[in-house]
């Protein structure tokens, strides 16, 4: 007879199994984190410096030495990357391969993927015959964004895969975001990677850049508004960087 788990009858409090990823990355870059507010609601919090998460202590120690911060294990995390390093760096030099920037568009509702396209055609669908067919999303950028805000259209799902220019041998990292601000100019970064890299890798800066402005209309009229946006700035081909 199999021995019962100590959590039998207490499943709600049973520690969750950590999620594992089917890729070979060693960590993730994040522009924010989640915390529980006074009302007990989990809310997102934006950062002005990068947070790096990993599941390997050696990687956490290495990025802390490179970019500042102290590795802290997040006991509540169910992710494979359960060690956080809140760095001192808003800008990190990275190496991006020719295929290192990927995006598509996804609409999630109640944890389920309801719409998956490339902005024009379905990328996946419950009906396989619909894959490759027009998805029906708005064509104009502002209309796409407005519809997504109302959960009537998908948001961008951007993934940037890279290694650290300061320690390429440490392994590959990912930055995943749904930022419309980055999405608006992502084609420029893609073009720069292709033009500068000429089929190879490029040296670039991954940065959280401060944006400040004063709206002339709306509830924040005549008040200073500030936020940090993720940016990708291609500097030179990696071959040229090595030669310097």
Swiss-Prot record:
Organism superkingdom: Viruses
**Known role:** Recombination directionality factor that interacts directly with the integrase tetramer to activate excision and inhibit integration.
- Location of region: Disordered: 1-34
Composition bias, Basic and acidic residues: 11-27
- Quick check: keyword Cell wall biogenesis/degradation in the entry? no
Query: What name goes with this protein?
Result: Recombination directionality factor
Chain's gene name: 3
InterPro entries on file = Gp3-like
The record's keywords, sorted A to Z, are: Viral genome excision
Induction is noted as: Expressed early in the viral replication cycle.
Complex formation:
Interacts with the integrase.
Q: Name one GO biological process term.
A: provirus excision
């Amino acid at each position: 007879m199999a021995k019962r788990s100590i959590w039998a009858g207490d499943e709600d409090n049973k520690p969750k199994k950590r999620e594992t990823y089917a890729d070979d990355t060693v960590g993730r870059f994040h522009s924010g984190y989640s915390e529980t507010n006074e009302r007990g609601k989990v809310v997102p919090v934006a950062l002005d410096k990068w947070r790096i998460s990993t599941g390997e202590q050696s990687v956490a120690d290495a990025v802390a030495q490179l970019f500042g911060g102290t590795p802290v294990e997040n006991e509540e995390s169910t992710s494979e990357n359960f060690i956080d390093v809140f760095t001192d760096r808003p800008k990190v030099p990275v190496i991006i391969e020719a295929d290192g920037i990927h995006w598509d568009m996804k609409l999630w509702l109640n944890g389920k993927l309801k719409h998956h396209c490339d902005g024009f055609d379905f990328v996946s669908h419950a009906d396989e015959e619909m894959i490759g067919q027009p998805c029906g999303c708005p064509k104009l950028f502002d209309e796409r964004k407005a519809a997504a805000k109302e959960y009537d259209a998908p948001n961008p799902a951007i993934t940037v895969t890279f290694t650290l220019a300061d320690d390429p041998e440490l392994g590959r990292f990912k930055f995943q975001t749904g930022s419309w601000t980055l999405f608006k100019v992502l084609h420029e970064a893609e073009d720069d990677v292709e033009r500068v890299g000429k089929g190879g890798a490029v040296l670039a800066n991954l940065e959280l850049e401060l944006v400040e402005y004063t709206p002339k209309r709306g509830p924040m009229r005549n008040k200073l508004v500030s936020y940090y946006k993720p940016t990708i700035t291609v500097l030179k081909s990696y071959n040229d960087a090595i030669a310097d």
